């Protein structure tokens, strides 16, 4: 009888981590930034149907990089958890920290299970507070660990270089246009040190805006409003108004809260 091939637990975990990291690195990067009136999500995404950013609950947003079908399952699970907890207890009992703990348990269990391949995803869960000091941003890598982030965070393919760029330039109290410009500059940087142009139609942008009168603070920035923000900052000035809910081409949340948000179930790496 031949001797079974032995792999140490340490080597097995290292191989699984490397597999997950390579899968995540194939996806496009995204950034999440705090600004004066909330939190902005910015990523390069040519698809108008397969979103990287979504609303989870009133003040909570979700961002993900990696394999689409895997993080979409996690997003739907998060929506169900938040709705059930808010209905059973109170809407204020639904927090980003609680949701991050649920995601961490799920990712950690899958990562350590030899019967399943690790998820090729990296998540960001963000909650906007009534004041900037109350904002919360949590990053969840493939292994289920939780990292409490402040100011800015980048996940996806070129995240290390982008994070360094953001850490050097992000500051408290930025306007939405300033934060958006910084995010686009960071995403435009190439691994070799060069820079490329990302047109507005390839950008996916959303905000958690604490100034919105509605209970639900999540809003997508698209169309003419996105173009105006980019053009305003390029001209060297900053807008004074919060994002309008009536701007043509904008969407407050569309179908983000529904379980059937997309028509595609293919394994799309974004």
From Swiss-Prot:
GO terms for molecular function: threonine-type endopeptidase activity. GO terms for biological process: modification-dependent protein catabolic process; proteasomal protein catabolic process. The formation of the proteasomal ATPase ARC-20S proteasome complex, likely via the docking of the C-termini of ARC into the intersubunit pockets in the alpha-rings, may trigger opening of the gate for substrate entry. Interconversion between the open-gate and close-gate conformations leads to a dynamic regulation of the 20S proteasome proteolysis activity. One of its GO terms (cellular component) is proteasome core complex, alpha-subunit complex. The keyword Cytoplasm applies. InterPro entries: Ntn_hydrolases_N, Proteasome_alpha, Proteasome_alpha-type, Proteasome_asu_bac, Proteasome_sua/b. PROSITE patterns: PROTEASOME_ALPHA_2 (PS51475). It is found in: Cytoplasm. Pathway: Protein degradation; proteasomal Pup-dependent pathway. Residues 229-270 are annotated as: Disordered. Keywords: Cytoplasm, Proteasome. Residues 244-253 have a biased composition (Acidic residues). Component of the proteasome core, a large protease complex with broad specificity involved in protein degradation. Belongs to the peptidase T1A family. The 20S proteasome core is composed of 14 alpha and 14 beta subunits that assemble into four stacked heptameric rings, resulting in a barrel-shaped structure. The two inner rings, each composed of seven catalytic beta subunits, are sandwiched by two outer rings, each composed of seven alpha subunits. The catalytic chamber with the active sites is on the inside of the barrel. Has a gated structure, the ends of the cylinder being occluded by the N-termini of the alpha-subunits. Is capped by the proteasome-associated ATPase, ARC. PANTHER family: PROTEASOME SUBUNIT ALPHA/BETA. This is Proteasome subunit alpha. The lineage of its organism: Bacteria, Bacillati, Actinomycetota, Actinomycetes, Kitasatosporales. The gene is prcA.
